[in-house]
């Protein structure tokens, strides 16, 4: 058996979140709303700094008084702690992208628009991106392999096909390619949700090494299955979602770059958290559209009784929400976790 080796280039077209499982509260980071920046804090160094300045007791009192409303930025400003001193306890800084939505017109607000309602809101808990033992950002090979597994299972490929693949962890990701994005549900309207994630930013290319240990399984077959899975996703679900009022605004905001259009048969793969039920399961890959809708609806009725449980009939689109987000500095919209894959042969082992 000849082992075939490939370089995998994952090009990010929608923010990718691979969660570390760690969530920090707004008392544990500094959110500068005016500049749309979040400064992630080293807790021990913050305590050391506050003790040195004689402010630690005041901070505890502030937390006790304000409770859930407490945020570190407000406390530092109240205590007149200069921003130049923040470097003592700030680990790194990221841009924050919040959804600022015109609910009447179902359009993103332009930051330069004269009729834009001024949105001055804080952040909630922040879901952090995975890092290795050295603190470097990376995407585990298991995350990419898991996404490929869904595609292969959807095409009814044997377990042998999946087990013949081995994928390395990615090369380290430059911290400058990390940003915070807010979850936005897209259907009848564009609905920002109180969920914030650290994500690999759009425009980043992440590299892996993949090996195929099979004489029968080829990179051409894998590419074909990825393309076919995206076509099923597109025809059976996505085209319906983008005809909703929110979906139309999403498209108008640049949510579907030409390179991702199904007519080009792109090797699109959805990766990471928040990409949505259709891309995480095989229902639309294996079943006729009507049957997939019925089966998904039955599952969602059990999981979300307050929404789907109240419905007597299967809605036109199931699930009813497209998972998206927006870069509020450019007003460009994205599907969460949408990526393009490229495979380049390295050699044979």
From Swiss-Prot:
GO terms for biological process: defense response to virus. GO terms for molecular function: RNA binding. It comes from the Bacteria. Belongs to the CRISPR-associated Csm5 family. CRISPR (clustered regularly interspaced short palindromic repeat) is an adaptive immune system that provides protection against mobile genetic elements (viruses, transposable elements and conjugative plasmids). CRISPR clusters contain spacers, sequences complementary to antecedent mobile elements, and target invading nucleic acids. CRISPR clusters are transcribed and processed into CRISPR RNA (crRNA). Part of the Csm effector complex that includes Cas10, Csm2, Csm3, Csm4 and Csm5. This is CRISPR system Cms protein Csm5. It comes from Enterococcus italicus (strain DSM 15952 / CCUG 50447 / LMG 22039 / TP 1.5). The lineage of its organism: Bacteria, Bacillati, Bacillota, Bacilli, Lactobacillales. The gene is csm5.
